[in-house]
Amino acid sequence: MAINLQTLFKKKREGKKITMVSTYDYWSAKLCDEVGIDCILVGDSLGTVVKGEGDTLSVTLEEIIYHTKCVMRGVKNAFVIADMPFMSYQVSMEKAVENCGRVIKETKAKAVKLEGGEEIAELVYKLTRIGIPVVGHVGFTPQHINVFGKPKVVGKKKEEEEKLRRDFRALEEAGAFMIVLESVPTHLAKELWKGSNSIVIGIGAGKYVDGQVLVFHDIVGLFEDFKPKFVRRYLEGAKLVKEALKNFKIDVEGGNFPSEEESYG
């Protein structure tokens, strides 16, 4: 059965954990959907995971639209969220609404995700009022990498903690139905979650939230460039793929592929 906002809020009310995976193509989305993953995020993390960039800043609106369309073709039930890339919603309210609307119309995703807190609250309010569900994202926000300097835990210092509370409340009050907390101390994430009517999804925010999100390539061990502390690999996918490719190379070079059975008479 197709998952919608009501399904997700029902899980929150019943204390059932929500699963989310960031993925970018038809096949990985299809696999996620077939095993019952609740939400798929077409994240701007495709900048690092798919494009091989050092950060997410180069991802374009057209790339998000392209990859979200690919994902949607593989999905029957999962709730698909499209990430709005850097500078697609920061220039002006008018341009932001236009771009978010374009993503929803062209991809048929169910929601958009925006990074930031108080500074985007007015936009979140506007989008929700015109029928575009919004996922917020606070804590460590990759689009602010040039401000942070490097990935870091946000909320250890008193001023960071206070700002995070303000940003979280601003998003919730503006109407964000879901808020992602990234790289936030467990006790602070728990505090925000306990007082929230929004769905709270963690990534490096401990277990006291409504659900968890990880990147597909991290879960299956395909991405080897770096491994954040919060990542749990469930498969050493890169090793398995390399072994298969090596065996293909050996068989071709040794004249063992193709066989008679793999050839047309």
From Swiss-Prot:
Ligand binding (3-methyl-2-oxobutanoate): 44-45, 83, 113
Residues that, per the record, bind Mg(2+): 44, 83, 115
Chief location category: cytoplasm
Cofactor(s) the protein requires to work: Mg(2+)
HAMAP family per the UniProt record, alphabetical: PanB (MF_00156)
GO MF terms, alphabetically ordered: 3-methyl-2-oxobutanoate hydroxymethyltransferase activity; magnesium ion binding
GO BP annotations, alphabetical order: pantothenate biosynthetic process
Annotated localization: Cytoplasm
Name of one Pfam family that matches: Pantoate_transf
Pathway annotation from the record: Cofactor biosynthesis; (R)-pantothenate biosynthesis; (R)-pantoate from 3-methyl-2-oxobutanoate: step 1/2
Encoding gene per record: panB
Listed name of the protein: 3-methyl-2-oxobutanoate hydroxymethyltransferase
